[in-house]
């Protein structure tokens, strides 16, 4: 699963624009756009900014592993956002899920 789509899902779940998220994480808007469109991979330093930021820590485990640990406060964005972005597929349509 592409990190860019996951970061976009996090941004949408948090009701942030690209400029707002880029400012929070302290990366350029261009870097964020390219990442969300999977044109480029984030450097480790930038990726760590997402996992350490207080607003996005709850997504850190999911961002890195595709799994959640709700009992530890580690969640994924709302399923409808993931479905809309193609991160998961609706298994009621006969397609397999991610």
Question: Model-flagged regions — what are they?
Answer:
Residues 25-42, 46:
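Recognition helix of helix-turn-helix/homeodomain-like DNA-binding domains
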Residues 45-61:
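DNA major-groove recognition helix of helix-turn-helix/homeodomain DNA-binding modules
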Residues 4, 29, 83-87:
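Terminal and domain-boundary regions
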């Amino acid at each position: 699963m592409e990190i860019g789509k996951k970061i976009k899902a996090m941004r949408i779940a948090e009701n942030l624009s690209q400029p707002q998220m880029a400012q929070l994480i302290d990366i350029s808007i261009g870097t964020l756009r390219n990442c969300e469109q999977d044109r480029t991979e984030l450097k480790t330093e930038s990726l760590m900014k997402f996992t350490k930021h207080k607003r996005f820590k709850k997504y850190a485990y999911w961002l890195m592993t595709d799994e959640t640990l709700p009992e530890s406060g580690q969640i994924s964005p709302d399923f409808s956002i993931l479905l809309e972005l193609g991160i998961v597929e609706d298994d009621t349509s006969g397609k397999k899920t991610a």
